[in-house]
């Protein structure tokens, strides 16, 4: 009625951190690193540096050949949610106008735990998605959508060599001292303008499709989460 296009949510996702458990365990045992250290963004940066240095030490005759530990699928989620965790909205909308909140100290924290470790080789983004980088052995862990879990590899392939791997699933990290806020994202459907009969039929379908039983079947097949709270319990 107001000329706007609305999307009706049919599937949801959030973010998680997934780890190549098979290659994580030798590193963790050798360095005393724990999974709990990955609970914060700063902790991941510290662990990634430690992993880079540990892998570099494995070849003392070859300097500066440490390996990246981590990557992220969505830079925008990192900045938007990271700022929110630290108590600020990076995009503030009022009366239809958007203001960019560039708090220098907070942006610096985000920069130091994203761009800096990428430049130093502690993080890496080489393939289209970070699950691709896990498969090629270029990283050990990544933060990405829950819907990407189905693509997490069961083997690592490096050249002509391949070996099976297991995995660990953790919460996505929180900025140190920040609020535990996670991203909410997902897919939706729209009903386009046509005639009353088709519009009504489409609305009935969407209502049926998002009911608990139907929606659960759909999201289990598509690796998403249901849109109704009752279906998540």
Language-model segments: which ranges?
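Extracytoplasmic/periplasmic solute-binding protein
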Residues: 2-17, 42-99, 139
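Short, solvent-exposed loop/beta-turn-alpha elements that line the ligand-binding surface or hinge
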Residues: 33-37, 62-64, 69, 88-109, ...
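Paired acidic/hydrophobic, glycine-rich loop segments that form the ligand-binding mouth/hinge
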Residues: 140-145
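Short helix-initiation/N-cap motifs at beta->coil->alpha
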Residues: 39-43, 123-136
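Extracytoplasmic/periplasmic substrate-recognition and gating elements
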Residues: 108, 120, 158-232
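Glycine-centered hinge/linker elements that transmit conformational signals in sensory
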Residues: 45-52, 93-127, 172
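A ligand-binding cleft/hinge motif common to bilobed small-molecule-binding domains
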Residues: 146-163
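A structural signal for short loop-to-beta-strand junctions that line the ligand-binding cleft
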Residues: 1-24, 168-182
